[in-house]
Amino acid sequence: MKLVFLGTSAAQPTTRRGLSCTCLKVEGEILMFDAGEGMQVPYLRSKLGWNKKMRIFITHLHGDHCLGLLGLLQTMSMQRRTESVEIYGPPGTDEFVAANARMLGFSPSFPVIMETTEEGTVVDAPGYEVSACRAEHSVEAFSYRFSEKGGPGRFSTEKARGLGVPEGELWGTLQGGSAVSVGGRTVLPSDVLGEGKRGRTVGFSGDTRPTDKLAEFFQGCDYLVFDSTFADEMVKRARETGHSTAAEAAALAKNAGVKNLILTHFSARYSDTDDLLREAQKIHPSSYAASDLLEVEV
């Protein structure tokens, strides 16, 4: 599993940073969080592929988070994509996509499935879930949390044989999480499996103020990608615009027991992110600054 940062700038691009877009590669599938203008070039450079299974999650309808959608859909059509694309976003996302497609006279070569984001579980896939929580921004906005479903613990052949379970199909049944019957006795998966494997979790804040609700939502995340628009000296501006400082992001991550914090969405006023990172690391040492084309193994 890998995080790929395609755009890490806030509101407007810089010569070194594009607009908001982060992808999570999950076993051949692309989960994209926001699609800011200009995200196609870094997408190409990251070699993520045009025809893989894809779900797109829009946090809110500000241009720096969604204006790349139509261009992305058009390019995938020109690449003769046939696999459907699912797009999740706040109310109005479907209208935004449909209106732009209509004005451009564009009809995609593949099904585009639009879903309106609400709090709670957004996607329940075989290997993972994506859930949403309301963020605190200047427009209706959502944060997302990816949760990998845990796997079964290690299968003990010694215990299975000791319980009289013959090798073969019944072993597979137990490993799959179902009980079996042997000689009139029921053998449970817990009788032969070790402690289950914990799934990995990744949070994506989008644009937001740090709130207690989000701290609870992101509790225990392995990685948290969080709005870090401003340095601490501009906390007043952060409050006025519905954003966070790097220090505020770090405080939330610390309170939520987040293992690794990744700062992103930096104001264009900052030519580099060193000062913001230092402010965050004073509070949460396992803090890192994202940069365009950065890839992080999860």
UniProtKB/Swiss-Prot annotation:
Domain of life, per lineage: Archaea
EC number: 3.1.26.11
Pfam families xrefs: Lactamase_B (PF00753), Lactamase_B_2 (PF12706)
Cofactor(s) it depends on: Zn(2+)
Active site: 64 (proton acceptor)
Top-level enzyme category: hydrolase
Binding positions (Zn(2+) 1): 60, 62, 137, 207
GO molecular function: 3'-tRNA processing endoribonuclease activity; zinc ion binding
Binding-site residues for Zn(2+) 2, renumbered to this chain: 64-65, 207, 265
Keywords attached to this entry: Endonuclease, Hydrolase, Metal-binding, Nuclease, tRNA processing, Zinc
Cofactor binding note of this UniProt entry: Binds 2 Zn(2+) ions.
Record-linked InterPro entries: Metallo-B-lactamas, RibonucZ/Hydroxyglut_hydro, RNase_Z/BN
Catalytic activity of the protein: Endonucleolytic cleavage of RNA, removing extra 3' nucleotides from tRNA precursor, generating 3' termini of tRNAs. A 3'-hydroxy group is left at the tRNA terminus and a 5'-phosphoryl group is left at the trailer molecule
Subunit structure: Homodimer.
Family in the record: Belongs to the RNase Z family.
Function: Zinc phosphodiesterase, which displays some tRNA 3'-processing endonuclease activity. Probably involved in tRNA maturation, by removing a 3'-trailer from precursor tRNA.
Protein name: Ribonuclease Z
Organism: Cenarchaeum symbiosum (strain A)
Gene for this chain: rnz
